[in-house]
Amino acid sequence: QLAKDGVLHTDCAHIFQAGKTEGKAADLHLYVHQLQSLAKAQKHQSFVVTTGTGSGKSLSFFIPIIDRIVKAKAADPQKRTRAIVIYPMNALANSQLEELDKFLHGYPAGEAPFTVARYTGQESAAERQEIASNPPDILLTNFMMLELILTRFEDVDRQVVEHCQGLEFLVLDELHTYRGRQGADVALLVRRLRERLKADQLVCI
């Protein structure tokens, strides 16, 4: 319904369907907190999502992010990374990558409405080079790897950073896990990232 009303890009009606991989595609009905998150993001306002396990927290940020990506690519097809999602553990990034792949189910190779890649230190040199050469719309990483990307002087990392210029979304999943010194480190990283990427309109979630 949101796509029909023009709130979301029309492609989102097909992307965000339940049961796609089981051949039982059905409309996805959003919870109130997901609708509120969408409204905030579309106004370029940062926000925090606090909700129970299994209540669709990830969709609270991925729906507005992917909607923005699809709309932006229609106007400017140049490849760049528009969103970085930081996870406290690689296992969470791996799991999220699998979930996002489900939303791409049914799209022919090379015709996916958005692209996503993991850059957590688990990747081979060839995989890192592919990310640098062919930047994903969404980059899944951890804060230590993001720190390395910003401080190392390897050509691959420089390319990744260059493709993130003007970053639009930065998500800190499981925000409550960053406490004490680590919390201070992450806060500083966010400030440095905003400055380095010239992300003046950055939405933090």
Which sequence ranges carry the predicted segments?
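Conserved motor-coupling elements within RecA-like helicase/translocase cores
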Residues: 122-139
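Pre-Walker A (Motif I) flank of P-loop NTPase domains
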Residues: 43-49, 63, 80-83, 136-137, ...
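Conserved helicase ATPase motor motifs in RecA-like P-loop NTPase domains
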Residues: 34, 49-55, 174-182, 192-205
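Conserved helix-turn-beta segment of the N-terminal RecA-like "Helicase ATP-binding" lobe
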Residues: 92-120, 193
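Conserved Walker A/P-loop ATP-binding site and its immediately adjacent core
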Residues: 80-103, 144-148
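Motif I (Walker A/P-loop) of helicase-class P-loop NTPases
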Residues: 58-69, 97, 186-189
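SF2 helicase catalytic motif II
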Residues: 144-148, 153-197
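Conserved pre-motif I regulatory segment
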Residues: 2-50, 60, 66
